[in-house]
Structures are given as C-alpha cells and as structure tokens.
A protein has these predicted regions:
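Short acidic, glycine/serine/threonine-rich loops at helix termini
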Residues: 19-26, 101-103, 142, 176-177, ...
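Structural motif
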Residues: 131-133, 165, 263-265
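Cysteine-nucleophile active-site neighborhood
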Residues: 136-212
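Short, glycine-/Ser/Thr-/acidic-enriched flexible segments
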Residues: 93-96, 120-121, 136-138, 171-172, ...
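Short, solvent-exposed amphipathic alpha-helical segments in soluble enzyme
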Residues: 1-2, 103-109, 146, 182, ...
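Phosphate-binding active sites in nucleotide-utilizing proteins
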Residues: 79-148, 152-159
Length: 280
C-alpha cells in the first residue's frame, strides 16, 4: 500500500514444485514433468491471484484471437509497409523455436511466411528471406549433421546472395562445426560461417540484455547461450555495429555479416524496425 501499487495476488511456495533448468526443458521427460507442474501452479494461481483484475490491466484483449501456427493474416499497427510482398521462410522445430510473437507478426506484415524444419526436413523452401531463430541445436547436433541436403541448399542460397537472418542457435547452424560436449564429436554444420562452436565441459551461461548501435537503426535483444566459439577463422564481421549491454559497456561479440547473411548470438526484438534496411 505504501508504494501505491495494487497487489493482484501471489504465488506461495509449493512443495514438490521444482522447475528444470532452462537448458533441459526441451527433453521429452522434462516437458512432461513441466506440464504437470504447470497445471498445479495454475490451480494455485486461481486461488491466490485476482485473475479478472490482472487481465483487466493488460494491454491486449483476451481471449487472444491468434493461436499457433501464426500466419500472414496477423494484423500489425506499424505504419511501415513493404514495397512488395516477399517470401519468408522461418525455421521452426524442436531445435529452433525461440521466437518472439511480435517478430513473427512483423514478418507476416512484410511477406508470406512458410515454416520449415532444419531438423526433420530435406527441402529448403523458396524464399526471399530466411529466418533462423534461436534454440538448442547442441541437443540435436547429430540429427542436424545428417541433414546434408538441407545444409547444402542453405549454403548455396547464402553463396548466391540470399538474405539470411540468424540468431543464437540459428547462427550455430550456419557454422562450420558443433561439439555438444568438449571431448565429443565435432558435427559438421552448414559451413556458411567458418566458425566452430562447442559446449564446454563446464557450461557457463552467457545471458543479458543487449543492443547494437550503428547502421541506420538500433536493435535490442537478449543473449542466452551455453555454446562458445572454439575457433573463429573469419573477419567477416559487421564492424560498423557495436554490441553493448544496457549500461553501455561494449560486449566482445561480433555481429557477423557474410554477403547477405546476418548472424549474432542475440535474440533480437525488432519492434517496428524496417528490417530490409539491414541489407541496404
């Protein structure tokens, strides 16, 4: 009451609730456990949180009219419109699924979205722009390594000047190789960026809010990764952009650019940015 902020409820400590680490929630066993715990937490929230008041304070209208899969009929209030509709291919499967809903809505405004799976698919869709979002490719390194046809098509697309935007795990898939453990097998990836990635024996989480300053726009995003660069044989970085944390201190990580391929460790939030300018 002293702060002038209404308390809409609380979640008490619950016996038996133990959420798995973020890095392991993608496994089948942990997903099953997580779903069961989510149901228990939901039941508790109904008892201790004023749900109706909470929803009344939200900016969005509920129930939300959009459900997965998101398609190109999503509306966006942004005034920036493309000159023409473009074909956009978005990777989406258990290895690549870290996307912001607003980013998908933004892409849907720019063009017609086709989803594809680097993990299970063989064909790369015809596209003017390919978006490889983040994920945990290190958990599927062997399976991805076997998708030779997919990786060859992706490399040919990049070499002939195709536009690719890769974030986090998406950038790892563009690399030369990936070791899911320090003394393990180096599985070959798409070899678009001459970079070797590895998950160290003692994985250290690199995380935090980031922004890039330079070019004609400022982008903000979040870094969350366990992989590190074991070897980087490239100078194909976009030196005009500097990545900093929110305090303004420079982060020692590059924003890679090779031909029309843009890649970084950051999961960017695009907002109403004119993304096409990234390739101008």
């Amino acid at each position: 009451a002293d702060t002038g902020v209404d308390c809409l409820g609380y979640l008490p400590s619950m016996e038996g609730i133990k959420l798995p680490p973020k890095h392991s929630v993608i496994s089948v066993a942990n997903r099953h456990s997580l779903n069961e715990q989510a149901d228990l937490i939901a039941e508790q929230l109904e008892k201790t949180v004023d749900i109706n008041r909470l929803l009344s304070r939200c900016n969005r209208n509920f129930p939300c009219p959009y459900t997965l899969p998101y398609t190109s009929d999503m509306e966006d209030d942004s005034p920036v419109l493309p000159i023409r509709k473009i074909k956009i291919a978005v990777a989406r499967d258990p290895a690549f699924n870290f996307t912001y809903r607003e980013n998908l809505a933004r892409l849907a405004k720019w063009g017609n979205i086709t989803y594809f799976s680097p993990l299970y698919g063989y064909e790369l869709p015809e596209a003017d722009l390919i978006y490889l979002p983040g994920g945990y490719p290190e958990l599927f390194a062997r399976q991805l390594h076997r998708r030779h046809k997919m990786m060859e098509a992706l490399k040919k697309y990049a070499e002939r000047g195709g536009k690719i935007l890769a974030e986090g795990g998406g950038m790892v898939f563009l690399g030369r190789s990936l070791k899911s453990k320090e003394n393990g097998t180096a599985y070959s990836m798409s070899n678009i960026l001459p970079i070797d990635f590895i998950v160290p024996a003692m994985p250290k989480l690199q995380s935090g809010y980031r922004k890039t300053v330079g070019e004609d726009m400022e982008l903000k995003g979040y870094e969350f990764r366990y992989t590190t660069i074991q070897q980087d044989d490239t100078l194909i970085t976009n030196r005009r952009s500097m990545i900093t944390n929110l305090k303004g201190s420079e982060e020692l990580m590059p924003f890679y650019r090779y031909k029309n391929v843009l890649a970084s460790h950051i999961h960017w939030y695009w907002g109403d940015k004119d993304l096409i300018k990234l390739w101008e």
